[in-house]
Amino acid sequence: MEDILLYFSLKYHGQFDLIYKALERKERVDESLKKELFATIKCSYTTIISDDYPQHLKFINCPPFVLYYYGSLSLLDNECIGVIGKRDCSEYGVKATRILVEDLVKQGLVIVSGMAKGIDGVGHRTALKSNGHTVAVLGSGIDYPYPPMNKELYDQLKNELIISEYPGLTPPRKDYFPKRNRIIAGLSQKLLVTEADIKSGTMITVGFALEQGKDVFAVPGRIYDSKGCNSLIQQGAKLVMSVEDILEE
C-alpha cells in the first residue's frame, strides 16, 4: 500500500485532492510508469501508513499521503514551535524574531517555519547560528529550493529537516503555500507570530493552528507594521514580550 500511495503522489505531484480521487476510484497502477516515477526519487520519504510518519499530522485536515524529506524526522520528537511572519519584515520584526528564537532553542525547542523570505528565513538562520534545530516545510517540490535567494539556507537545512508533500522538482504554485501552512501548524505544538499583516499567509497558518487547538502567541508591534499581530492579540492570542511568556503556557 505504501508503494501505491507513493505512486499516486508522484503521478499527481503531491496534490492531495487528485491523489484522494485516484484512490477513491481505485485507479489502476501503470507498472511501467511506476518504475519510471520511482527512479526519479532522490530523497527519503514516508507515507501516512508508515511507522515513522509524524503522528501529529495524522489528525489535521487533509493530512499529506506522502511526505518527502531530507534530514532526520526524529527532530519532530522534540517540542516544536512554529515561528512565522511577514516576508517584507521590519528591523523590529527581525530583532524580535532573533531574540525569541535564540531563547527558544536554548530551552530545547525546535523551530518550524516555511523557508520563505523575511521572518521565516530569520527564524531558521537564527536557530542554526544558535546551535539549535529547525525544520523547513516547503511550498514547492522537495528538490526545488524556493525562493532562490534561500538556496544556501536550503543546503544547510538538509542537515536538519526539510519536508514537502510535493515531490522532486515540482515548481511552486500560489495555492501550494496556504496548503503548506497546514503542515507547519500541524507539526508545531505552539505557534509564534513575530510580525504580520492582517491579510497574509501568516494569518492562514494561524487559522490552521486554531482549528487544530494550538496555542497562538504574538509579538505586539507598531500599528503601521504589524496590524496582524495586534489584531491577534485583540482576539485572544497571548501577547509575547519575552520567551517566558511562551514557556509559561
What residues fall within each predicted segment?
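Glycine-biased, small-residue-rich flexible motifs in mid-sequence functional cores and linkers
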Residues: 48-249
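Short, small/acidic-rich helices and loops at N termini and domain boundaries
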Residues: 1-52
